[in-house]
């Protein structure tokens, strides 16, 4: 979590007597001494520093040791003059810049740096060797150094393609300069490292010297020079790419002088905290491996191995130091001095700097035998690369060639694909450019049509409610007139029935109320007025029949009393004119192109002829019937097929205008919507109009109105079979309206009075005339019902006409009628109302079941006529026999052959076969 600070196990040694003496001498002014001669013997402690200087600074003449009381001290501690000060000039020695430097800033969460920087470096006094031994060691060191230099040059030539960024070069020392290694050898080595570029040839020797500083004797405490050399070695390994630090924490030691790089510590910390967004530069070994095509896995494995090896070595060093050093600290100063004197006497020179006991460790076998058992050897990380063979290079090149061939093949396929895509795109462009002709005009036309349709719909959204109101008003006007006529007929029937029933029954009634609970005086007053009006209408109808010569064939009750008063006619016409006037003002503020069927049709015909596909895709053929619906309903506002002067809708302008819509030279499809334009309009406009007429205006008692309704219905069925059929919803609604109106008439308007036969004997009496009128009106209604044959089903008609009217009312009138010629005539008129198709396909000798009661009445009528003729004159018998033959013929006409044969056999009618065949 936090960065660990690298610890340097440097402990401060106890003060000795010699150090106290040296501090006393330093307080005294230094004497001015001449520079020592080259052949002068080194002082105490000087001999052991000279070899170290040679090992660190490279080969060359050994400089004379300074005259100092303590080994390792430079000119500042001794009496010599350092730098460029001449002897005897009296100048004070130059102070070190380290003393004036500020204490570096401590790292976060660590106080170790400040303690380590302020501690004094522990120095070990070493015993002097003799001059002879020193010379011998120098000679052997030079020989070993030359051998190592040759080896270094060979390694440098192998790595010549990757020059080192920074190379440590040793400084050539001149014996005459009098410069010696001071107490702070680290500072002077930093000063010499700044001149690396001036002396590049010395780098190999220095690298070789650093590579040998990898062994530390157990219990030995490294000094500043050793620590600095180790840091230089590690820095060099990092720069060469052969070593990766085993921890990611910033190093606490400084590779250069503290006075020159104090500010670099803070920069390093900032760099460690800063997120790196750039690509990390590869090491020189990795670059070389990539150039020759070797995979990076070997180099990664090598770096990982070196990291593990370095980590293991560092751990063992720390363990060894922790075990041995406390023993040194626990001893007395005198014992320590004795221990170090004995150690230096038995230890070969240079062992404290990582050199294996002597300078002969580089190639001498004697040096190997001098190692003790407690020395732990560590393998120096090698900077050499893995061997590269011809086969390896050939294999890598072959693999790379194969991969390039595969890549080339893929690129070639992509190239061909792009070429084909380019050709297809070119063709598509040409095709689109060729087909783009008229798109602008088409877009312009469609935009105009879009605006026109929007305006048309906005106009209709405002005008359609007005059209609906006018249509409702005209329907209400016709409904009121029809209801008034029906109500008048019902009142006349009630008046006559009340009048004749009171005469026949002579019932006692309340003085002020009639039989219906009405005010007698007021009712009688209104009844008198209605009777006068009714008789006046009948007189006018009789006069009209006399003028036309139809008086002889007319039967009372067959005519319809639909005459209106002048007041009603005037009011009706005024209201009708008002509605028509308002209808003419509906589109008076609208342009003709938005209400004229011809103009609207022309717009869509232009669209259809120019851009038929878009016209078809927009389903205009399905929208046109709904679009023309309000305009057609406005023209059909007063259209009523019940009137004699009603105009046929197929002769109107809107029908003629839309009749040839979409008819062009090209062949039309069967399922095209434009072909069904007029049938769809008939379905959506005409049928709903007829439904309203059937519910509110049609009178089933009126033969004329019924004939006209049947005529228009059959015309629609025959002329528009695709829409006017039993499966069509609007057709079903229309037929239901007709059927409901007939049922209502049957329940509300049919009335058959029952009088005793003695009352009906007087054929000029009011009850007889009223009875005859009601009978013939029922027969008339039966005929009107049966006019719908072919429209309604046989079952529906038989149920409505035979069961509901004939068997319920007419047969009851037959029972009260006189048996004779009048009954036969009435029966003949009833049978004439039946459709002949009912009896054509009957099998057997029996008629339809609903007519069984009527046939029995005819058989009973024949028997009654025969019984009445017994005992009469021959003329009466002959008339009775003719009536019986007529009854047999009537039975045969309704396919009641069983009853006809029975009557003929009972009454000895011999011409049965001729009567049946001549039916």
UniProtKB/Swiss-Prot annotation:
Residues 1-11 have a biased composition (Basic residues). One of its GO terms (biological process) is regulation of skeletal muscle satellite cell proliferation. It is found in: Nucleus. Residues 163-174, 237-258 have a biased composition (Basic and acidic residues). The keyword Transcription applies. There is a cross-link at residue 151 (Glycyl lysine isopeptide (Lys-Gly) (interchain with G-Cter in SUMO2)). Residues 1-120, 151-206, 237-277, 533-566 are annotated as: Disordered. Pfam families: GCFC. Residues 16-28, 185-195, 259-270 have a biased composition (Acidic residues). Residues 75-87 have a biased composition (Gly residues). PANTHER family: GC-RICH SEQUENCE DNA-BINDING FACTOR, PAX3- AND PAX7-BINDING PROTEIN 1. Adapter protein linking the transcription factors PAX3 and PAX7 to the histone methylation machinery and involved in myogenesis. Associates with a histone methyltransferase complex that specifically mediates dimethylation and trimethylation of 'Lys-4' of histone H3. Mediates the recruitment of that complex to the transcription factors PAX3 and PAX7 on chromatin to regulate the expression of genes involved in muscle progenitor cells proliferation including ID3 and CDC20. This is PAX3- and PAX7-binding protein 1. It comes from Mus musculus (Mouse). The gene is Paxbp1.
């Amino acid at each position: 979590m936090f960065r660990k600070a690298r610890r340097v196990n440097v402990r401060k040694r106890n003060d000795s007597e010699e150090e106290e003496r040296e501090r006393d001498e330093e307080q005294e002014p230094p004497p001015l001494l001449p520079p020592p001669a080259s052949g002068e013997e080194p002082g105490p402690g000087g001999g052991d520093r000279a070899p170290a200087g040679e090992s660190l600074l490279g080969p060359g003449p050994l400089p004379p040791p300074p005259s100092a009381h303590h080994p390792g001290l430079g000119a500042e501690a001794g009496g010599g003059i350092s730098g460029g000060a001449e002897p005897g000039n009296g100048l004070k020695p130059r102070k070190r810049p380290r003393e004036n430097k500020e204490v570096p800033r401590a790292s976060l969460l660590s106080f170790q740096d400040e303690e380590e920087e302020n501690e004094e470096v522990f120095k070990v006094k070493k015993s002097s060797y003799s001059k002879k031994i020193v010379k011998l060691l120098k000679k052997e060191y030079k020989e070993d150094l030359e051998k190592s230099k040759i080896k270094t040059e060979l390694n440098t030539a192998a790595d010549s393609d990757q020059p080192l960024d920074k190379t440590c070069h040793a400084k050539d020392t001149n014996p005459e300069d009098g410069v010696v290694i001071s107490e702070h050898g680290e500072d002077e080595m930093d000063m010499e490292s700044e001149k690396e570029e001036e002396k590049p040839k010395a780098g190999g020797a220095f690298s070789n010297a650093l590579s040998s500083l990898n062994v530390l004797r157990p219990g030995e405490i490294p000094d500043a020079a050793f620590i600095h050399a180790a840091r230089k070695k590690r820095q060099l390994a990092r720069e060469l790419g052969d070593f990766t630090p085993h921890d990611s924490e910033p190093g606490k030691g400084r590779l250069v002088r503290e006075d020159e790089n104090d500010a670099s510590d803070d920069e390093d910390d900032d760099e460690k905290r800063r997120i790196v967004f750039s690509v990390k530069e590869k090491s020189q070994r990795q670059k070389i491996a990539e150039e020759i095509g070797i995979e990076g896995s070997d180099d990664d494995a090598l770096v990982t191995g070196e990291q593990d090896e370095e980590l293991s070595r560092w751990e063992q060093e720390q363990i060894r130091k922790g075990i041995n050093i406390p023993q040194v600290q626990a001893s007395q100063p005198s014992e320590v001095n004795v221990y170090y004197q004995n150690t230096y006497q038995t230890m070969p020179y240079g062992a404290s700097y990582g050199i294996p006991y002597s300078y002969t460790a580089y190639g001498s076998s004697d040096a190997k035998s001098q190692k003790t058992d407690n020395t732990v050897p560590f393998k120096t990380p090698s900077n050499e690369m893995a061997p590269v063979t011809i086969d390896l290079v050939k294999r890598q090149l072959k693999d790379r060639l194969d991969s390039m061939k595969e890549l080339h093949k893929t690129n070639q396929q992509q190239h061909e694909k792009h070429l084909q895509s380019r050709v297809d795109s070119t063709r598509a462009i040409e095709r689109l450019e060729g087909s783009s002709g008229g798109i602008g005009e088409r877009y312009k036309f469609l935009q105009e049509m879009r605006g026109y349709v929007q305006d048309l719909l906005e106009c209709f959204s405002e005008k359609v409610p007005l059209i609906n109101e006018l249509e409702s008003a005209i329907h209400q006007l016709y409904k009121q007139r029809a209801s008034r006529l029906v109500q008048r007929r019902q009142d006349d029937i009630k008046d006559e029935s009340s009048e004749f029933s009171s005469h026949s029954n002579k019932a006692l009634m309340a003085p002020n109320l009639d039989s219906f609970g009405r005010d007698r005086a007021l009712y009688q007053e209104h009844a008198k007025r209605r009777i006068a009006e009714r008789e006046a209408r009948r007189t006018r109808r009789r006069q009209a029949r006399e003028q036309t010569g139809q008086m002889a064939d007319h039967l009372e009750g067959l005519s319809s009393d639909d005459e209106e008063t002048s007041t009603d006619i005037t009011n009706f016409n005024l209201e009708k004119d008002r509605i028509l006037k308002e209808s003419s003002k509906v589109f008076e503020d609208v342009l003709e192109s938005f209400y004229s069927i011809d103009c609207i049709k022309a717009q869509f015909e232009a669209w259809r002829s120019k851009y038929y596909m878009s016209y078809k895709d927009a389903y205009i053929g399905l929208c046109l019937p709904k679009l023309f619906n309000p305009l057609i309903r406005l023209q059909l506002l007063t259209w009523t097929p019940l009137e004699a002067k009603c105009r046929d809708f197929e002769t109107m302008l809107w029908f003629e205008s839309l009749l040839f819509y979409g008819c062009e030279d090209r062949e039309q499809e069967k399922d095209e919507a434009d072909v069904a334009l007029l049938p769809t309009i008939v379905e959506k406009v005409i049928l709903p109009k007829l439904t309203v007429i059937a519910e509110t205006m049609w009178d089933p008692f009126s033969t004329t109105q019924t004939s006209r309704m049947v005529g228009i219905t059959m015309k629609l069925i025959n002329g528009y079979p695709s829409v006017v059929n039993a499966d069509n919803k609007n057709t079903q609604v229309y037929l239901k309206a007709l059927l409901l109106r007939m049922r209502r008439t049957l329940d509300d308007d049919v009335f058959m009075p029952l009088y005793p036969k003695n009352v009906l004997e007087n054929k000029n009496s009011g009850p007889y005339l009223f009875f005859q009128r009601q009978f013939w009106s029922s027969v008339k209604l039966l005929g009107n019902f049966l006019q719908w044959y072919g429209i309604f089903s046989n079952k529906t008609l038989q149920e409505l006409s035979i069961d509901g009217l004939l068997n319920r009312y007419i047969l009851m009138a037959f029972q009260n009628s006189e048996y004779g010629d009048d009954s036969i005539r009435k029966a003949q008129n009833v049978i004439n109302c039946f459709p002949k198709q009912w009896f054509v396909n009957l099998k057997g000798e029996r008629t339809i079941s609903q007519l069984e009661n009527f046939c029995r009445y005819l058989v009973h009528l024949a028997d009654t006529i025969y019984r009445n003729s017994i005992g009469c004159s021959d003329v009466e018998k002959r008339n009775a026999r003719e009536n019986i033959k007529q009854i047999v013929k009537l039975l045969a006409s309704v396919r009641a052959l069983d009853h006809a044969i029975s009557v003929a056999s009972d009454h000895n009618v011999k011409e049965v076969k001729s009567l049946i065949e001549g039916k």
